[in-house]
Amino acid sequence: TDSIVLIGVDNYLGATHEFYDSFYNYIKKNMKKDQIVMDLADTYAARWINSPRRNTFLEELIYQGKKLYLKDLWVPSTEDYIKIGYTEEELQWAEANEFYIWQYFVENELLYSTEPKLLTRFINPGPFSRFNLELDSESPGSIGRYIGWKIIRSYVKNNNTSLLQMLQMDAQSIFNKAKFKPKN
């Protein structure tokens, strides 16, 4: 049914709870009660957004960005690092390195790549994002979600489009009109 939400409270006992001793830290960090609303918002957002064909990395970035943007609207008083499931330090790293992350994606021609491993490297949860560089261990996981969020925010700032129209737009149209350009 569409009117019932089941929440496994055993997923939110706190990052240091003994039940999670065998879990990796990148998973444990979000197993706390303030993440319940974020997880519900993420699940609900997925129902509002046309699921991409997921043929290109850009389509996945935009899809993830749309989900995070809905959190901006639904829980505006929540800190960004909580919305994306980062620590404060991880979000600071992403913000400080946004230009270089984007440069890496562009220079390595990842945006139109259909390589499935890009999801593992940059979208899916992990201890860090996998650029295959020395700085990998410094980066937060799922950095592609952050970049997608920034693209959507840039699109919304630079275009007068309704929320519903934006959610239904294809990734390429959003990207073309977003005017996304991280500062160095």
Regions found by a protein language model. Give the residues of each.
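A cross-kingdom marker for long, charged
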Residues: 58, 62, 67-184
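Acidic/His-rich structured neighborhood in mature extracellular/periplasmic domains
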Residues: 1-91, 168-171
